[in-house]
Amino acid sequence: IFGGTVGVSLLALYQQGDGLRAQNYQLILFESAALFFFFLIFQKWKRPFLLLVPALVCLVLINHAANGKAGNLVQKEDYQEITDSAWQDAVRDALDGETGLCRTEQSGVAKKRKDNVNRIWNMRQWTTSVYSSAYDTEYQNFRNNVFQVEQPFRNGLMQSASANPLFQKFMGVKYVIGRSEDGENFTTEVQETAAPVIYGTSQILSEKTYQTMEFPYNQTMLMQYAVTDEENIAEHGVTKTKGIQETNVTFTAKHGVTKEDDSWKIRTKKNQKSTLSLDEDTSGKERILYLQFDVENEHPNRDVSIVINGIRNKLTAKSHLYYNGNTTFTYVMKLSADQKKVNVTLGKGTYRICNLKSYVSDTTVLEDDSLYQSTFTPDWNATKGNQISGSIEMEQDGYLITSIPYDSHLEIKVDGREVVTEKVNTAFVGCRMVSGEHWVTITYHAPGLSAGKWISLAGILLWAGMWLLTRKFSRAEKNL
């Protein structure tokens, strides 16, 4: 046991390499040596407490060092804030008057988003976040590689609510619930032009054309068109998002930032406050800043994180079990009128920021809702469990578009007849629809559900049969 513990500890220490983890594994080595010492004493005195007491002491010390001291334990005040039932009241109040299908999320910094990644307060609260080993690969790929939302956490499977206003609009996040600055009251930000979760449109773009769109058009074009794999689409009227202009930005800090040609070299032993300056004339109106760059980590076994305007991106150490592979950091944010500087926190480490792309535009792309020509109206009496039902009036032939991740077990019926489902917007379920008024039902058939029910029934019958046979044999033995 001692040899195995030491071997694993040394291997982990070699692979991790950074200071905090090195201290933790040194503690494990010390624990192993101490336990081995008391084991030798036990061999002579044969007193159980010689093994039990040192083991308990080591467990407490290691837990304090690895969790408590590192800040991994949830504080009582934080837990009370996270689970405060007042959040439930705020979400309910926001959804009480809502008749459509939309999403509702909680705002906050990365830590708050992490706390609420799988949390809902109401059965009608739909979110964009998920943290599960049984994740949808299409949706995961869309977030990370197609739309390229920020990735604030070490674990690549932890997909939290995004601060990207374009992603929020695309996914139908209509309500964002938060706390006021004094922390006393709740605030509800209503995004009236957010996409319906289900809608009809004839503004179609082929996936082949969409795949040629580079940042930031890979995001903005999804506000103007629905993407399908139909190749025979007349795209002569398709135009790129207007009003997006390239701009120059500069990172400045007191220490640790060096400009090198078209890149910035970061070398800092602790988090460094910095400023991102925009080289442009402000319009006196709100704007959107689109920012993307690659991160070259010179110490790949250490994490790198950069926070810009409260939005965090993190590149995990390659040795991490759930390495996120986030080598391209993307930020999309709204700027207030006349704002030319953005606060930045450069995480500790040695790395290079390169291949930087920066653009600005007005907020028209957020305000335009012409894509959503026909809105789906849910029937809340028929919408429950694994089924969504409602009506839609298509103004012209086109597609039924949803922001429900595509799955082969999803079934769509239009006017009672099953139709062929298609993958739309590269990762979501949809289908073709003709003009007119229709009744739509979307049903999810869980794979293995029927087989599971039959197996459970067979198990119950077998158990009942065994119970009856046992009683019969018991009575027969008593009669002998």
Place the predicted regions along the sequence by residue.
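Hydrophobic, well-ordered secondary-structure elements that form the walls
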Residues: I1, T104, R124, V176, ...
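Contiguous transmembrane helix-bundle modules in multi-pass membrane proteins
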Residues: I1-D84, S435-L480
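Beta-sheet entry/capping signal
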Residues: L50-L59, L101-T104, K174-Y175, I288-Y290, ...
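Membrane-proximal, lumen/periplasm-facing interface regions of secretory-pathway glyco-
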Residues: H64-A90, H320-G325, L356, V365-Q373
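Structural motif
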Residues: Q106-A110, G178-E181, F293-D294
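Catalytic cores of secreted or luminal carbohydrate-active enzymes
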Residues: F167-Y175, S180-K259, R352-D368
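Active-site-proximal, structured, solvent-exposed surfaces of multi-pass membrane proteins
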Residues: Q245-L480
